[in-house]
């Protein structure tokens, strides 16, 4: 793992030990949760039944997946893995800019969309960490 100064040496060692598994986890979780039609990542997926439990798609899942894909792409030496990471990165980028960004309100994102693609009234997270934002009051 390339050191970026973002973590302590002990944290980077632990991350480095698990880094080889990250592209596999990324690919499977993306396959489980990405809804290509409406362009987003669902909130919950049941690993036993292989069904979406909550098809609401919060905005933040896409940039977080882009970050994971970028890390896996950067750290992988395998061309096939790098290509898969770029495909995930591209799909998330395109979905975010096509379906979540709102130019009419200074590029603010839609918080949550439903499976049909329309804006959902659902609040994407709990309000304890950031009461203003997560309640739509900020």
Language-model features, listed with the residues they occupy:
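Glycan-recognition and catalytic cores of secretory/periplasmic carbohydrate-active enzymes
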Residues: 1-138
């Amino acid at each position: 793992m390339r050191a970026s100064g973002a973590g302590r040496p002990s944290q980077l060692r632990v991350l480095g030990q698990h880094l080889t598994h990250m592209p596999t986890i990324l690919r499977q979780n993306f396959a489980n949760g990405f809804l290509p039609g409406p362009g987003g990542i669902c909130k919950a997926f049941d690993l036993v039944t292989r069904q979406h439990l909550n098809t609401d798609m919060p905005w933040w899942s896409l940039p977080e997946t882009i970050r994971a894909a970028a890390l896996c792409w950067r750290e992988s030496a395998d061309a096939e893995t790098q290509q898969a990471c770029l495909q995930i990165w591209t799909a998330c980028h395109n979905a975010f800019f096509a379906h979540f960004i709102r130019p009419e309100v200074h590029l603010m994102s839609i918080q949550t969309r439903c499976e049909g693609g329309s804006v959902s009234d659902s609040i994407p997270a709990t309000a304890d960490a950031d009461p203003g934002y997560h309640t739509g009051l900020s």
